[in-house]
Amino acid sequence: MNPINSIQDALYFAFQRKHWAELRKSVPLTLSQAELENLRGMNEKLSLDEVTDIYLPLSRLLNLFVGSKQQRGLVLDKFLEQKASPGPYIISIAGSVAVGKSTTARILQTLLQRWPEHPKVDLVTTDGFLYPLADLKRKGLLQRKGFPESYDMKMLVEFISAVKAGQKEILAPLYSHVTYDRCHDEHQAIRQPDILILEGLNVLQTGLDTPIDTRRPFVSDFVDFSIYVDADESLLKEWYKQRFLQFRKGAFSDPNSFFHHYSCLTDDEANTIAANIWDTINGPNLSLNIQPTRERANLILQKGPNHLMDRVLLRK
């Protein structure tokens, strides 16, 4: 027996797509085809059927969890005889490069903010918490971008802690995929949302992953519900190569792009470079740092070919 499957059987309820879709119950589809087009990621053939079968049941589940936390807050208010400030419900979304985390995050944000109980849903990506490009170069970490050490974890934890504490306004740094760098003069203002979705590669990490300093808080300490978007590495590598080819024709063609020199590559050259980037950076980061955190998630979305979800694992 595969030990990974054995662990998952012990920790999770497993649902094939058909059975998971039945858990939607009567939740209405409030997303139009036009809206879906704006939310869809590069190379993803996401359909309204996928939203109906996978994301509507998930939004129903999350709505129930958020409601449970809100009720708990009322209990605390009554016990303390004062208004407690529980802060927003925080959902983290982890997974490999090219797996479709951003699309999952955007769809959930759109669906969750249409529930009347929690209309204000903000989405923050951890890309903005990468060290600035100059710092990465100075530290010799440019080829380790995306690895845990390339993030300003102190800054990220301070941000998520302030959000959880209910601070009125917190500024999150933004990231430019054109300049491949943090935006130094642009920020995203977070003002006491009902729900915060935090999307990034390493948001499931704990002190177990950094034994040198196990006492400091981690992002996962502040998260109420965690999601891991999963797929076989062979699929992930192929999706990454496809995305690289799309970027070559699109974002890389911008003269201001950090990767503008890739825009003149032939298809064969682009495929070779993308495969090498995967084999030397993204693949090792997946196997060493990202995939080992998978079984910490409250829910695992497993993708098959064409980015279609075929299995959902819900922690018992």
Swiss-Prot record:
GO molecular function: ATP binding; pantothenate kinase activity
Annotated CDD domains: PanK
Keywords of the record: ATP-binding, Coenzyme A biosynthesis, Cytoplasm, Kinase, Nucleotide-binding, Transferase
GO biological process: coenzyme A biosynthetic process
Keyword ATP-binding: yes
Superkingdom assignment: Bacteria
Pathway as given in its UniProt record: Cofactor biosynthesis; coenzyme A biosynthesis; CoA from (R)-pantothenate: step 1/5
Chemical reaction(s) catalysed: (R)-pantothenate + ATP = (R)-4'-phosphopantothenate + ADP + H(+)
Subcellular location per the Swiss-Prot or TrEMBL entry: Cytoplasm
InterPro entries: P-loop_NTPase (IPR027417), PanK (IPR004566), PRK/URK (IPR006083)
Keyword Nucleotide-binding set for record: yes
GO cellular component: cytoplasm
Record-listed E.C. numbers: 2.7.1.33
Main subcellular location: cytoplasm
Residues where ATP binds: 95-102
Family recorded in the similarity comment: Belongs to the prokaryotic pantothenate kinase family.
Name of the protein described by the UniProt record: Pantothenate kinase
Species the sequence originates in: Shewanella frigidimarina (strain NCIMB 400)
Taxonomic path: Bacteria, Pseudomonadati, Pseudomonadota, Gammaproteobacteria, Alteromonadales
Gene that encodes the chain: coaA
